[in-house]
Regions:
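General N-terminal targeting signals
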Residues: 27, 45-47, 69-72, 159, ...
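N-terminal beta-strand motif that seeds the catalytic metal site of vicinal oxygen chelate
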Residues: 1-19, 74-81, 121-155, 211-216, ...
Length: 285
């Protein structure tokens, strides 16, 4: 059982640049620096809200170096989720055909989706001291051509209850998708998206990279403070016509160059329910 999306892992040739970007834009704080021999990387972890972002920089050969050699740029390499029993979650994933490796009290889970390694990390539940302008991460997005197949792989690997899943469609961004909501009443999920318009940004990304992580999404109380911290051209803002600039937009999308290779959406509190199956839960401004 998974309870929340608790981290993103970023493969990067320059961890310091990524860390500094998250500190500058989101007020994130460094909480850990160590080596991960099994990944052939050094790791710098920043706290962003109640969630963590791990920057992995190669210090030799291994899967992080391989991913960077293939992609040629920093990118979301894996997504993490918390579980009350990571060992049990690992057994479920292994029985579903995933490749599983232990790292201390957490587990790396690798699924093959359309020939690509899609990686996750399952960690114990933990109370974290919040830092910065975010409240918490709640979503990591996987792009896949075979949406049903990818959803089934993730469902089976993590023992998720598909009766809680909901669908999502966007003509504006050119996709259809499924939100694999972990628990009733909570936003945390993996999003599986199939681009349907090759002329749009997501469609072009998928055509170039294939099955892969695309972005993360978070919630924050004060999106205006995040707006103010981002250089011109580094963010797309969704503020309804007529709403005062002093009030929160509904959401923003922070572009990858602004955050060290990570595309991050940030929504105001409750707003994500608008596209998560329960629009009545959205608090109006």
């Amino acid at each position: 059982m998974l309870t929340e999306v608790d981290r993103l892992l970023v493969a990067t040739p320059d961890a310091a640049a990524g860390v500094n970007a998250w500190k500058r834009v989101l007020g994130a704080e460094v909480v850990r620096h160590d080596a991960v021999p099994g990944l052939g990387a050094v790791r710098t972890v920043v706290r962003a809200g109640r969630s963590d972002v791990e920057f992995l920089q190669p210090d030799g050969t291994g899967p992080v170096a391989d991913a960077l050699a293939r992609r040629g740029r920093a990118h979301v390499w894996a997504a993490g989720a918390a579980s009350p029993d990571p060992a049990a979650a690992a057994r479920t994933a292994r029985s579903a055909g995933a490749r599983v490796e232990a790292e201390g009290d957490r587990y790396h889970v690798e699924l093959e989706i359309e020939g690509a390694p899609i990686r996750f990390v399952v960690s114990p539940e933990a109370e974290r001291q919040p830092a910065g302008r975010l409240d918490f991460l709640y979503e990591a997005t996987v792009l896949a051509a075979d949406q049903a197949g990818a959803v089934a792989r993730i469902r089976d690997a993590f023992g998720l209850d598909e009766t809680g899943f909901t669908t999502i469609t966007s003509e504006l961004f050119g996709y259809t998708g499924v939100l694999t909501l972990f628990r009733p009443g909570q936003l945390h999920r993996f999003e599986v998206i199939t681009p349907i318009d090759s002329t749009k940004t997501m469609g072009r990304y998928h055509a170039r990279e294939g099955a892969s992580f695309y972005m993360g999404f978070a919630e924050a109380q004060d999106l205006t403070a995040i707006e103010a911290a981002i250089p011109a051209g580094g963010v797309t803002i969704d503020r309804p016509e007529g709403r005062s600039p002093s009030l929160n937009p509904d959401q923003v999308w922070i572009h990858p160059p602004t955050l060290g290779g990570v595309m991050l959406g940030v929504s105001r509190p409750s707003m994500a329910w608008m596209w998560s199956g329960f629009p009545e839960r959205v608090t109006p401004l």
